[in-house]
Amino acid sequence: MYEGKHIHFSEVDNKPLCSYSPKLCKQRRLNGYAFCIRHVLEDKTAPFKQCEYVAKYNSQRCTNPIPKSEDRRYCNSHLQVLGFIPKKERKKKTDPVDEVKARHQMDAMAFSLTVPTLALKMPNGLDSMSLSPPGARVPLHYLDTELEDPFAFNEEDDDLKKGVTVRKKLQSKLAQNRQRQRETEILKVRQEHFSTPPTPPQQHTHLSPLSTSLKPPAPPQGSVCKSPQPQNTSLPMQGVAPTTHSIAQIRQASHKRPLPLLPSSRAPISDAPRTDRILMKAAAFSPHLSCISRLQRLVKLCTQKRQLDADLFPHLGLDWSEESGEELEDADQASPYQVAWSIRETLRHERHTSDDDDMESRSSRVTQLCTYFQQKYKHLCRLERAESRQKKCRHTFRKALLQAASKEPECTGQLIQELRRAACSRASLRQTKLKEVEPAACSGTVKGEQCTKQALPFTRHCFQHILLNRSQQLFSSCTAKFADGQQCSVPVFDITHQTPLCEEHAKKMDNFLRGDNSRKVQHQQQRKPRKKTKPPALTKKHKKKRRRGPRRPQKPIPPAVPQGNLSMPTSVSLPVEASQMRSPSTPELSADELPDDIANEITDIPHDLELNQEDFADVLPRLPDDLQDFDFFEGKNGDLLPTTEEAEELERALQAVTSLECLSTIGVLSQSDGVPVQGLSDRGMGVFSTGTDASGIQSLSREVNTDLGELLNGRIVHDSFSSLELDENLLHSAPLSSPPTALAGQIQGQFSAPASAGLTSATLLSQSALGERAFPGQFHGLHDGSHASQRPHPAQLLSKADDLITSRQQYSSDHSHSSPHGSHYDSEHVPSPYSDHITSPHTSYSGDNMAATFSAEMPIMAQHLLPTQLEVPLGGVVNPRTHWGNLPVNLGDPSAFSNLLGADGHLLSTSLSTPPTTSNSETTQPAFATVTPSSSSVLPGLPQTSFSGMGPSAELMASTSPKQQLPQFSAAFGHQLSSHSGIPKDLQPSHSSIAPPTGFTATGATATSTNNASPPFPSPN
């Protein structure tokens, strides 16, 4: 079984519901299918087909299913729309009591129908029937039970099978309605009119219960104040008193006796033996009140009947539709039988005529004719009964009026006057609704005098003064104004426009609009011949411009650079201006090649023309449709503000510039400080100072920081940087191969005991952009033999090296936790470089060994050197648990820092791409690789002193890569350094460095904060 997409079950009995795919349907499924009857067409295997009706308004086909077994093309709804079957009638509410009576008490009426002999011989299923006598009666309940016409034609014809079901329903409904209506009309009236109880022959004794027994019951629908049968007024008024006691009995028996329905010619004969019904004389009703009460009761019944026939709620605005109105008119003229069958026969006749079906059998036509005559006969019988009821009602009312007038004329006269007064009031109400109100004079005043004009209907003002009536909502004042600004006050009756205009201003507006259109047409006509006179080349060049509409004189475009007064002076030569504004699409045209008519036209353009609304009328419709999606003031992403990536990039660049400016003030701040311990501690550059000649160390720090500030502030121009790679002559082999032992001895003499410190590779690598270029003349004589007097302070070199190490390591240690790998900037966690907050990180050194190593009065080392960067092993042995990226360096050997300065006074930088130096010992390379794996760069300036206990014969600067990559500081500030120091953009170094060790990222070098700095080494207690 095929199922749709929506598989769901009922919440009541958990049975599967319709699985219609497009939307959720909660109808029950058909047996054997997964869809309801409305959506069963989704299952292609179902024995249903789709209705072929196509709607005119949307050209969509009807989706109602039709069983394939039925030979029809349309569903039931569209069969009614197309007129093939009659439309459904409106159901009328009936009294349930009447339904019970109509169901159990069948009508005695029967109709006689003589069947033609020709119809009996035709093959219509009636061959076995015999001729019915003229008086044969077919009971009406036959239609209620069988619901089929006994004289119906054969249903073998396919075209006639379509309306079988509808015809059966129609016949059953019509028969039931007619039966109910006839029963209620006949039975109720017989019970209410002049039915006296059986009494003795005395006249005065049988009238007292009459007044009590004749209480008017609630009139049901269809009850009329009519007598049971017509009275023969031509018969004499015989006062047969002994027969009055049998009146009630006869009438009660008449309820059970069938009433023969005969043609109108036989009706008087049927009423002949019932002459005793009119034996009630006025003398028989001596109490006067009984006559008046009977008359009042009859009047009340007639009024109720009239109210039942009238509209129930006319004041609510409820009215019949056009279709229902037509149906009511047809029902007044003919019975539902005649209406239904006449429409059916007409449709059949039209269909047969259009199809030109000559093969229709004679039997079907005869059967059809018999059916029509049957319905026609029933209709005539119904009309005859209705007419007889009307006559009985009028006769009864006249008799009651005569009796009341003879016995109690005064009361009868009052009753008649009341009836006339009520009738006159109803008629006057109708007349007041229809007739017009008499015109009255206007109540307005003109210059203090009463207006003599006639007032408008239903008002007290004329048309001129109608605006004085504040309650009216039909008229409004003209919304136009005169030339002097005065508002027009003419009343206007205009309910279609939001801005009503009087007749005068409406004409002016029409003329203006008509003139505007004529001007447009004239303008277009003037433009057409000018197009034809254009040269072919020029027309071809400016083909796209001509599509934009008529040429309007406009002001010349002002020059790009303001010339003081932004308004265009009139003395400017317009032809020259036009030649300057010529489009680059026509570079071959010069001012001399322009046609004369164009030059003359340009010179004739006035300079004070303003753009009007009509100037854009022809231009805006010619603009392309896709121009509305283009915004001249938006970016390519469609927003006015920069994107998130652009904003973050801009913020990082500004923070980087701020960091550079902070670094550039190092030299100035260091010169103002006189204490060597606090000289550069706030900037993250500590100084190893001893008790010997602190002023020399301070002067060296000032010189270095001054040149560093000049480098960062761009005072050193890019002309002095010929390449980002250091020349080989800057790396002399003498200091690299033979470190001075004198400096080592002095350093060992300065410190009381040898100390081994673990400098991380990131710390040694941090000697980056601070010394990115050689500083000319600052350290020129430090390694020169002729200036040996300037070299007795190796602590200065150590201080300078640690200054650089500490400042760069501070960037690494402070921001390695806040910046993700792979990003150059961190816009969220950039602390202030002026922060002096100091935390206490974990320490891994021994206090006893430090007490033996440094004296109590030794100045504080770099505050920003973390304890993980300085490892002091016990007993001079290197800590076997080396941290990632830590490189143990012996602080007692100054040769580890002596070669940071070249032979000719240049500070060597490990941040630039330097060529690999030759190693004296190949055995030291694996050891270095194990200590600093994945380091960002190698250290070309370090000597072959003891690294992790290795001998001084090894040179650890060898590298397997041909070029050393930029470290983190240079990678982060490459753009800012190039913009400040003038490094060309094409010479900026690459950022594709080797992955740094854990804890140090490229972003960590971008910040300049001193947060999380390590405390200084404690003094021994």
Curated annotation (Swiss-Prot):
UniProt biased composition (Low complexity): 911-926, 995-1014
Pfam families: zf-C3Hc3H (PF13891)
Subcellular location as annotated: Nucleus
Keyword vocabulary terms for this entry: DNA damage, DNA recombination, DNA repair, Isopeptide bond, Nucleus, Phosphoprotein, Transcription, Transcription regulation, Ubl conjugation
GO biological process, one term: chromatin remodeling
Gene Ontology CC terms: Ino80 complex
Signal peptide annotation: none
Chain positions covered by the region annotation Disordered: 194-239, 514-570, 808-844, 911-940, 976-1021
This protein's record includes keyword Flavoprotein: no
Modified residues (Phosphoserine): S132
UniProt keyword Lipid biosynthesis present: no
Residue spans of biased composition, Polar residues class: 224-239, 931-940
Composition skew (Basic residues), residue ranges: 520-554
Purpose of the protein: Putative regulatory component of the chromatin remodeling INO80 complex which is involved in transcriptional regulation, DNA replication and probably DNA repair.
Assembly and binders: Component of the chromatin remodeling INO80 complex; specifically part of a complex module associated with the N-terminus of INO80.
Stated family: Belongs to the INO80D family.
Record-given protein name: INO80 complex subunit D
Species this chain originates from: Mus musculus (Mouse)
